[in-house]
Amino acid sequence: MNSLIKSTKFLKKTNIIRSYCTKTNNNNNTNITKNVLSEIEKEKLKRQIIERIIRVDHAGEFGAARIYEGQLAVLANTKEGPLIREMADQEKEHQAKFNQLIYEKRVRPTILSPIWNVAGFGLGYVSALMGKEAAMAVTVAVETVISDHYNDQLRQLNDAGIDDKELKETIKKFRDDELEHMHIGIEHDAELAPLYKPFSELVKVGTKTAIWLSTRV
């Protein structure tokens, strides 16, 4: 009888241990699954951030190059012509780099490129018709917004823990180029343009809107 009681107790303990081990294993498996899913979501988010950055920067550099081309259509043979051409050539270098990145990283370009093609050239052309001061005012406004945008992107990459050295170095270099263009515009009488402040603010709003749309569409 005592032997039977001991056997029964032993079986109960064994079942309890088995149940505990099963629950523990299930919990461990659940935690592992959650961790794997969490890592997948993190990588997916990082990929989305990179895609958005490359898409909008690709569009932005294309638009900037078109602005300078529009200005050159009017001012190519003036004293400011060579300077504008130099800035245009830099923007084309930026555009070529993002053409490379958009291909290598398989990023879908914005569907709005045909609009930025016309709008960029039109803004450059009309501002140049208003005078070289207005053309430089456009340069200052656009490059101010773009350089700030590049700084925001660098912070976003750091906050998300994205260690893409090529992309970061590209953004840093291009930001510095845009800041140089901004200073060139100021040095060449941008602030003497008619209605400089409201005109500049209007261009900035338009540029920010283009950035917002190109990031998403």
Curated annotation (Swiss-Prot):
Pathway(s) annotated for this protein in UniProt: Cofactor biosynthesis; ubiquinone biosynthesis
Record's catalysed reaction(s): a 5-methoxy-2-methyl-3-(all-trans-polyprenyl)benzoquinone + NADH + O2 = a 3-demethylubiquinone + NAD(+) + H2O
Ranges for the Sequence repeats: 49-130, 131-217
Enzyme class: oxidoreductase
Binding site for NADH: 52, 216
PANTHER family: 5-DEMETHOXYUBIQUINONE HYDROXYLASE, MITOCHONDRIAL (PTHR11237:SF4), COENZYME Q10 BIOSYNTHESIS PROTEIN 7 (PTHR11237)
Misc. remarks from the entry: This protein may be expected to contain an N-terminal transit peptide but none has been predicted.
Protein function: Catalyzes the hydroxylation of the 5-methoxy-2-methyl-3-(all-trans-polyprenyl)benzoquinone at the C6 position and participates in the biosynthesis of ubiquinone. Catalyzes the reaction through a substrate-mediated reduction pathway, whereby NADH shuttles electrons to 5-methoxy-2-methyl-3-(all-trans-decaprenyl)benzoquinone, which then transfers the electrons to the two Fe(3+) centers.
Protein name (database record): NADPH-dependent 3-demethoxyubiquinone 3-hydroxylase, mitochondrial
